[in-house]
Every structure is written in C-alpha cells, then in structure tokens.
Amino acid sequence: MAKGPVIVITGTPGTGKSTHAALLANESPVPLRHINVSEWVKERELYEKYDEEWQTYTVDEDRLLDDLEPLVAEGGLILDWHTCEAFPERWADLVVVLRCDHTKLWERLEARGYPLKKIQENNEAEIMQVVLEEARSSYAPEIVVELESENMENLESNVTRIGGWITTWLKNQESS
Ligand SMILES: Nc1ncnc2c1ncn2[C@@H]1O[C@H](COP(=O)(O)OP(=O)(O)O)[C@@H](O)[C@H]1O
C-alpha cells in the first residue's frame, strides 16, 4: 500500500489547525498521524528557553527537524504548526493555510486566556496574512491552499476537500 502524504496545516494560532487536523486524521482515506508541533516541542523539550514575556517557547529548530525527519520519511503525517517556513520544502505534499476573520480570531484567543499583547500580535499577523505569505514564499504555489475556517460548515467542507485531495494523491502515487 502506498504511504500517505505529508500535509502541513498552518495558520495563525486560533484559526483551527488542531481542530482540522483531528477531524482529518479521523476521516482520511489513509491513516495519518497528527503531530501538534507546539505540543511535541514541549513534550520532547525541543526548545532553547521559555520566553516569560510572550509566554512561548523558543524552539530549537535544528533538533526539531532532526526529530521529525524519520516520521516524515515514513509519510502519512499531519504537521500542525503556526509557522511552516522552518520545514524543508521537500517535506510537504500539501500546505493548508487556515484563515479566519480577525474579530472571530480575537474572541477565540481571548477564550483561550491569551494575554492581551499576544492576542494583539496574532490578530495583526492574521490581518497582514503573515502565515500565508510565509507559506507562499516557502513552497511551490500549486501545493499551497488557503482555506477559510470561520464556522463548522467551513471545517467540514475543508476536511472533505483535503480528503478528496488525498484520494487523488494516492491514485497518482500508484500510477507513477
Ligand atoms: N472552523 C471553525 N468553526 C468554528 N470554530 C472553530 C473552527 N476552527 C476552530 N474553531 C474553534 O476555535 C478554537 C481554536 O481552534 P484550534 O483548532 O485549537 O486552533 P489552532 O490549532 O489553530 O490554534 C477552538 O475553540 C475551536 O473549537
């Protein structure tokens, strides 16, 4: 059986990456392992330090990439992270960038208990489409897809659409 693709799901924090990844892992036509990269970094202590001011970890990217490389080689992976430019271009078969209206995003981050400064920073990043630009400058345009993640209907249709893409990808792998 063909191994599964490597799908990067990225977007500003709160856009719905983990929600999409969990549903996709459940509904995918081929088994996919969901790696929440932020959690992975914490669990495996792949960071240099904890930044108190921003309440985030400064990731040790070299160690992170070494750690993920064997999993990527196996395939069948969802990499869920708020940034994507650190990953080697060859890793990704598909890069999904989730987008959300900034007032909705603000509410989601507030509900998460983020400090105001962090909400403002992320909100601004979403308005300026920082993650989308990052994805577009790091990967071939044909593998980058921008999807709206504002409501449950978006969530369901996005996951169905990515599932359809996986089915085609598998067929292409078999015939090549
Ligand atoms: N498409 C969506 N429609 C409605 N709520 C969503 C959607 N995507 C995410 N959410 C909600 O927004 C919050 C943040 O989602 P999450 O998946 O944790 O975001 P991320 O992983 O990008 O930080 C959660 O409460 C989740 O239920």
Language model: regions and residue ranges:
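NTP-dependent small-molecule kinase module
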Residues: 106-107, 114, 136-176
